[in-house]
A protein has these predicted regions:
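Phosphodiester-processing cores and adjacent nucleic acid-binding clamps
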Residues: 1-252
Length: 252
């Protein structure tokens, strides 16, 4: 099971930082790279919603001699037309080499400078390199998820590449149903599945700190949220921690 780390550079999604392990203090924020060092990880798989933290992650991995596998989680739509807003879903694009990193920058710029934070598949195909990029379909918020569980109408064109389907088991009520849909898509289309775990905090006991952070980041005028009434959909698991991943894995 692959651990997919996310940092605070993906605002509202993680309480982990990319700080130098030597600068992490007791009682302070946990660092992805401190976790990696303490647990002897030879690689860090980092999946972010932005490229803002990429250089810091790259620099830190070089300093520590750890392999960095960086993925950009990006919104996709059927087209840029307003009526296709309901087709929005997520994909993950991993860079395989230096050219892949440059292409990620072009893809990110296209999504956020030309469009309002999304691409369609024609845009993606124009910028794609099979040798330098790898496409993965995330478990949550993918086209499989929105089409089956959110009344979405995503029509993805992934014929230009050989993707991998991610699936997770985090004790959420929807996990079993969604996993079956992913498995069905995998069999029907001959696409491999890989088990992963999204990691947003270090210890299971950090779940309340993570919840408080999400409440702050998701504040809405007129809505009173608290730890007793967080109003965070599908937020009922402490599995999104490194500790939970470690309990199920001896080595990486």
């Amino acid at each position: 099971m692959l651990p997919l780390f996310k940092s605070h550079f993906s605002i509202g999604k993680s309480i982990l930082t990319l700080d130098d392990p030597k600068k992490v203090t007791e009682g302070g924020s946990d660092s992805v790279f401190k976790i990696a060092k303490d647990n002897g990880l030879k690689q860090v798989i980092l999946v972010e919603d932005t490229l803002i933290g990429f250089f810091e992650a790259y620099k830190r991995s070089k300093e520590m001699g750890i392999q960095l596998i960086f993925g950009l989680r990006l919104s996709m739509r059927n087209s840029a037309l307003p009526e296709d807003e309901g087709s929005q879903h997520k994909i993950i694009i991993f860079a395989k080499d230096d050219l892949g990193c440059k292409l990620l920058n072009k893809i990110y710029s296209k999504a956020f400078c030309t469009n309002t934070g999304f691409l369609d598949y024609n845009d993606l195909k124009d910028l794609w390199s099979e040798d330098s990029l790898k496409l993965a379909i995330p478990f949550y918020d993918s086209f499989i998820y929105i089409n089956n569980l959110s009344f979405g109408n995503a029509v993805p064109d992934i014929s230009f590449t050989k993707p991998t389907l991610f699936f997770e088991e985090n004790d959420l009520a929807l996990d079993f149903i969604l996993k079956e849909k992913v498995k069905e898509f995998s069999i029907n289309n001959g696409i491999p599945m890989t088990k992963v775990r999204s990691i947003y905090y270090n210890k299971k006991s950090d779940v309340k700190a993570f919840m408080a952070y999400k409440i702050i980041c998701n504040r809405t005028f007129g809505r009173d949220r608290s730890l007793d009434k967080p109003e965070l959909p599908h937020f009922c698991s402490d599995k999104f921690s490194f500790e939970a991943w470690k309990e199920e894995n001896v080595t990486i």
